[in-house]
């Protein structure tokens, strides 16, 4: 499974540098209805231990001004704590790019190589 530059903690997103733009879509955590809707999705409170997780690669940009990299870091840590043997949960942090906008061709190729490498490894695919 691959998740690129995700927003995972909806209760904190409005406090992020670009968070004000997400309020219209996701609501404010001070509003009871928004809090009730967003609370079950928090990576710090959800429990993926109830079922096995697939191998995962999450990506983020170290200097992303649109999506706080802490979202991917927290989600990765939570999933790693619940991962099954042989099902790695990996975080790829790009030091020179944000969430894809302005990424160089070599950065895009490097990220896609990692995505496909994990997929091929998990499917047991080998070079001929």
Model-derived features: positions:
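Active-site-proximal cap/loop segments of hydrolase catalytic domains
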Residues: 1-128
């Amino acid at each position: 499974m691959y998740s690129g530059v995700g927003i995972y903690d909806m209760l904190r997103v409005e406090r992020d540098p670009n968070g004000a733009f997400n309020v219209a879509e996701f609501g404010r955590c001070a509003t009871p209805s928004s809090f009730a809707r967003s609370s079950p999705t928090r990576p710090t409170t959800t429990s993926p231990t109830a079922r096995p997780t697939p191998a995962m690669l999450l990506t983020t940009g170290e200097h992303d001004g649109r999506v706080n990299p802490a979202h991917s870091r927290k989600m990765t840590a939570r999933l790693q704590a619940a991962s099954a043997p042989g099902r790695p949960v990996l975080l790829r942090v790009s030091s020179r790019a944000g969430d894809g906008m302005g990424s160089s061709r070599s950065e895009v190729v490097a990220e896609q190589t990692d995505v496909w490498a994990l997929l091929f490894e998990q499917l047991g695919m080998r070079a001929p």
